[in-house]
Design a protein with these regions (language model features):
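N-terminal secretory signal peptides that target proteins for export/translocation
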Residues: 1-14
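Short, low-complexity N-terminal intrinsically disordered segments enriched in polar/charged residues
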Residues: 13-14, 20-47, 59
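Solvent-exposed, acidic/flexible segments
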Residues: 38, 50, 74-78
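Stable alpha-helical elements in mature extracytoplasmic
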Residues: 41, 45, 53, 80-85
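Short, well-ordered alpha-helical segments enriched in acidic and aromatic residues
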Residues: 53-64
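A short gly/proline-enriched turn/hairpin at secondary-structure junctions
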Residues: 66-74
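Surface-exposed, charged secondary-structure patches
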Residues: 82-121
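Short beta-strand edge/turn micro-motifs at domain boundaries
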Residues: 121-145
Length: 145
């Protein structure tokens, strides 16, 4: 009887895992799950964040971008976002940046990463969308852990 219950329990758990596995692997609309390898669009963006290069990073911003940096949230122009990121990188020089989750859905791609800057740990979320002329950053969030 015990063996029968254990087998049924294992089968039940296996069915649940197999049912949820595709949802977890494909992202299910949640940016915290998905492919570990970032899309090619995020390769240069990651490089510019790691280098603390606000000028090159801002070239990937739409004309208006939603920026959330250390509890300052605003929708701003590309030039304002460039200045805000430049000021952040001056105060917190990046030491490392690594993407650990990525997801995509239709014309939107997003990644979640960790950045160490100025001895502090930050969570970074980047949302890029394609409006016909390629992927550009529409939203960037940098929050201290």
């Amino acid at each position: 009887m015990t063996l029968y219950l254990q087998t049924n329990c294992h089968q039940f758990l296996l069915r649940k895992v197999l049912y949820l596995l595709p949802v977890l692997l494909l992202g299910g609309g949640c940016p915290l799950f998905g492919q570990v390898n970032a899309d090619a669009v995020f390769v240069p963006i990651s490089k510019y964040i790691y280098e603390g290069d606000a000028e090159k990073l801002s070239a990937w911003f739409y004309d208006t971008v939603e920026l959330s940096v250390e509890n300052e949230d605003a929708v701003m122009s590309r030039s304002q976002a460039y200045r805000m990121m430049g000021a952040f990188f001056e105060r917190h020089r990046p030491e490392s940046f690594q993407i650990y989750h990525s997801a995509s859905k239709s014309s939107v791609k997003c990644v979640v990463g960790k950045m160490v800057a100025g001895g502090e740990n930050y969570n970074v979320s980047i949302f890029a969308s394609n409006r016909g002329d390629g992927y550009m950053i529409q939203k960037l969030q940098i929050q201290k852990e």
